[in-house]
Amino acid sequence: MAKAKFERVKPHVNIGTIGHVDHGKTTLTAAITTVLAKRGLAQQKRYDEIDNAPEERERGITINTAHVEYETEKRHYAHVDCPGHADYVKNMITGAAQMDGAILVVSAADGPMPQTREHILLARQVGVPYIVVFLNKADMVDDPELMELVEMEVRDLLSTYEFPGDEVPVVAGSALKALECGCGKEDCPWCGKILELMDKVDEYIPTPQRDVDKPFLMPVEDVFTITGRGTVATGRVERGRITIGEEVEIVGLMDAPRKTVVTGLEMFRKVLDEAVAGDNIGALLRGVDRKEIERGQVLAKPGTIKPHRKFFAEVYVLTKEEGGRHTPFFNGYRPQFYFRTTDVTGVIHLPEGVEMVMPGDNVKIHIELITPIAIEEGLRFAIREGGRTVGAGVVTAIEE
């Protein structure tokens, strides 16, 4: 009898190419798919297929992003590449393309440029944890000392933004030459470098922890009472797992978290013993009155998340064309901040030397909410005014 094919499920990692315009990010993306396709690990994508990325909308913001997928011997990758600089800014701030690591592409012929710096800063701010460097256009640099100089410059720049500049893997090659050759052989002077780069990505960027292995958290979407049983909070489990009889905390919209026990779990009217990340559930809570829990709070594993009012964030302000504001805003601007399931009013404080923020800008700001919310670094939010989105942000540091 015919045996079913054994398919090993490889660990999945999200990565992306970042770096200055015209340094070769898209060419490298095409080269990676071309070289790996020769080994049966990818579908070859042409430069123009990647470059003409479709428009997507994330939180009302228009972003052009190309998604390609490929495998190495060890892992499966989803890779994002953006045609324009503004697309990177929006992508990284909205978290439309969450990256577990990034390949920073720097032209060896030009060295680090303004967007190189800006992308490294953004990666630091929004929590891209690991960077691997590809020094592109190495075929245009004859002087090995110049190559070393550029590498040192990139390492210093990474260290400036608190990446381990001395440890970061750096591979020099030519994406264009590899793309033109496309033999995919390890001993090829061009294709070999692409394989070497992917080896470094395999080794250096760790496989991320799966959502289900993180501590339990569920944003509360709705609350109702079951006569004779008690109060039920419904929502989608964002991460972790929860079992009947476990203790949880209700966090947010009040100064201190409140403990309770989950005494029942339901999904689609069926009773569950356990719910995991991605499940839409109703959780029956012991001793909690209907008035003591509301939308906008979260249920969480005790001690894993706290309510906060003051924090720093990196934000992108929508342009008029994206449906955002037509005019700048100033220090003391009071919009709503939409976290998970609810709007909370807050005040924006601009950094010193920044007079105003124009539509289309990205800027680091300080926010003070009027009521505490369950917040942690890396949490995404929308800035809204009268029900329409005028900006997107990510929490970069918590003050109190």
Swiss-Prot record:
One of its GO terms (cellular component) is cytosol. Keywords: Cytoplasm, Elongation factor, GTP-binding, Hydrolase, Magnesium, Metal-binding, Nucleotide-binding, Protein biosynthesis. It comes from the Bacteria. It is an enzyme of class 3 (hydrolase). GTP binds at residues 19-26, 81-85, 136-139. Residues 10-209 form the tr-type G domain. Residues 81-84 are annotated as: G3. Residues 19-26 are annotated as: G1. It catalyses: GTP + H2O = GDP + phosphate + H(+). Residues 174-176 are annotated as: G5. It holds the Pfam family GTP_EFTU. GTP hydrolase that promotes the GTP-dependent binding of aminoacyl-tRNA to the A-site of ribosomes during protein biosynthesis. This is Elongation factor Tu 1. The lineage of its organism: Bacteria, Bacillati, Bacillota, Clostridia, Thermoanaerobacterales.
